[in-house]
Amino acid sequence: MISDSIPKELILEIMLRLPAKSIARFHCVSKQWASMLSRPYFTELFLTSSSTQPRLLFAIKRNGLWCFFSLPKHQSPYDNSSSSLVVAADFHMKFLPNKIQMYSSSENRKLSCCYASGLTYFYDMYSEVRVICNPITGRYASLPYLKRYRKELSFFGFDPIDKQFKEWLKYAYSLRDDKFFTHDVFVVRVTATEMNTIQRVEIQGFGECQHEYDYYRSRVVYVFADHVEDLDVNDPKLLESKEEEEEEEEEEEEEEEEEEEEEEEEEEEESKEREKEKKIETVIGGWIKQYWACFLRKSWELNPHR
C-alpha cells in the first residue's frame, strides 16, 4: 500500500528514475502499485524520461533463448572515459516454438530487429514472421501476414500523435550493420559516428566456444538504439543515406547494364566467329567436292571400261 505520508507525485518521480527491471518487479507489490505503474500516463512519462538518456540494448540468441543486455547510463558508449565495458543480462526470454516458428538450422537465415518505446520488433525474412515483444514482461505477439516486396526493409516505430505502434515498410534513414566477433571474449563494438570513436562492450555469460561450428551457429547479435528524435522525411540531411543507397543501386544497375552489353558483344563476336567458320567450312567443302569430281572424271577418262 502506498504510504499516505509520501505524496503520489514524489513516488512517481522516484519511479521514473529507476530501471525498467525494477518497475516490472514493483507490479507485484500490490494491486494499487500495479494499477499505478500500468497506466498509460506513467508509461509515457517513463519512456519520455528514458529517451533523454541514450542507451543501447543488445539482444543475443543462444540455443533458442534470447538474452537482453541494457547499457547503463554511466557507461554510455559516447563517453570516452573508458575503452571497455562489461554488462550482464537484464532479461531472458524464449518464444514458444508451437506458436511462433522463428528459428531454423539454415545458416542463411536473416532476422531484422528494431526497437521503439520499450518494445522490440523481430522480423524473420525467411518465413516472413513478424513478432513484437516486451522483454520486461516477457509478453509477445505476432503481427498479421503482410505482403512483402523485393528489396523491402521493415522497421518498427511509435507514433506519438495517436499513441499507436506502427510497422514501417518504408524508411527515411538506414544504418549500417557491422559485426565483430572474438573467440576469447564475447564483445560488441559500438561506433559513435559523430565523435569517430569505437567503444568495446563485453557481454558476460558467453565464454569461449568449444567448436568453431557451434560459435557461428548458436550466437547472433542484434543492436538496438534507444533514442527518440523528431525526423523530417523531407530533410535532405536525413535522406543522405537513402540517396547514397539509391546511388549505389544506380551504379550497380549501370554495372549490370555494362556487363550485359559486354556479354551481348561477346555473343555477337562468337556468332560472327561461328558464321565465319561455317563459311570457311562451306568453301572448303566446295573445294573438296570439286576436287573429288575432277578426280573421278580424270579416272574415268583414263580407264573408261572400268
Swiss-Prot record:
User: Where are the coiled-coil regions?
Assistant: none
Q: Which Gene3D superfamilies match?
A: 1.20.1280.50
* InterPro entries according to UniProt: F-box-like_dom_sf, F-box_dom
Which residue windows does the record flag with biased composition (Acidic residues)? Answer: 242-270
Name this polypeptide is given: Putative F-box protein At1g47300
Task: List the SUPFAM superfamilies.
Answer: F-box domain
Chain residue ranges for the region called Disordered: 235-278
Q: What SMART domains does its record include?
A: FBOX
Which residue intervals define the domain F-box in the entry? Answer: 1-45
Which interval of the chain is the signal sequence? Answer: none
